[in-house]
Design a protein with these regions (language model features):
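FIC/Doc superfamily catalytic core
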Residues: 1-303
């Protein structure tokens, strides 16, 4: 990820890394757009998709888009006409932002919004990731989230087969209940995982603070601690900007943190990066643990 941040055109960067980096940037951009207005407009949705896909194509204008299964068979044909797509997206925009239309709980409404968005399939590319960002931003504008930290994509990707089956089942059989329960379960699971992760990060920050204060003494600042946890890595420029200090001072602070074994220094090209390896390990181990728990659940279910 730090390589992607320094040079998104580098051949050494995997496509998956670029995709994650684009997702993070699109989510941050979307949050910036909605946090003050509390509105999620089609203009904002187009902007989010533009950041994701690095193009300005907007909604589909040319027919021919179909959704296929793994065998290559067409299972669903979304609206083809450009005017139709604009019409449906205008209706969806109103449903998202006008609470007088429906008194449904926001979580149930989120599940409906997501299904409608995926069924309209307004873009040539990036519909899935854009739709999942829309989920999170909707919870933000409804003040169920202060910041967009509920990573529903993990749940959707892990249960991809069931996700697509239920999407189609609503289209064919109007089976809304099973779909909504699936999405609510995703919110519940993801919320529990996020709470656990936040608690672990909080514990780790307290441990870092305990080690830093005696060494830094009077020059210790909480902004420095926060900087180490804003990203899995930091560098001299980040410290300079966050603390308002000179380059030599920032470099000195980072070297002190390396000596304390709180950061690991590596060189990428001409730049030095300082990795918070304990934070990286926490996220990596958490990811493996979630996968193991899901595997155990599947095994138990089929015993």
């Amino acid at each position: 990820m730090y390589r992607a941040a320094s040079d998104t055109k580098s051949l050494a960067i995997s496509a998956a890394t670029k995709e994650v980096f684009s997702y993070v940037e699109a989510l941050k951009h979307g949050f910036f757009l909605v946090r003050k207005t509390k509105l999620l407009t089609n203009t904002s949705i187009k902007d989010i998709q533009q950041v994701l896909e690095h193009n300005n194509a907007g909604f589909r204008r040319v027919p021919g888009t179909t959704l296929k299964n793994q065998l290559g068979e067409i299972v669903y044909t979304p609206p083809q006409n450009a005017d139709e797509i604009e019409f449906y997206m205008a209706n969806l925009e109103k449903f998202i932002n006008d609470d007088t239309i429906s008194e449904l709980d926001p979580l149930i409404k989120m599940a409906i919004i997501h299904h409608q968005f995926e069924s309209i399939h307004p873009f040539f590319d990036g519909n899935g990731r854009t739709g999942r960002i829309v989920n999170i931003l909707y919870l933000v504008i409804k003040e169920l989230l202060d910041i967009p930290i509920l990573y529903l994509s993990r749940y959707v990707i892990r249960n991809k087969g069931e996700y697509y089956r239920l999407l189609q089942d609503v289209r064919v059989n109007n089976s809304w209940e099973e779909w909504i329960i699936f999405m609510l379960k995703g919110v519940e699971e993801t919320a529990e995982q996020t709470i656990y992760l936040v608690k672990q990060v909080s514990i780790m920050m307290a441990e870092y603070k305990f080690k830093m204060r005696p060494v830094f003494g009077k020059v210790y600042r909480h902004e420095l601690l926060n900087n180490l946890f804003n990203h899995p890595y930091t560098k001299i420029e980040f410290i300079m900007n966050d603390l308002g200090i000179k380059r030599l001072t920032a470099a000195k602070y980072l070297d002190m943190l390396v000596d304390l074994e709180l950061l690991k220094k590596i060189k990428v090209g001409r730049e030095n990066y300082y990795l918070n390896t304990k934070l990286i390990d926490l996220f990596m181990n958490f990811s493996v643990e979630v996968q193991d728990n899901e595997l155990n659940r599947i095994i138990t279910t089929h015993e």
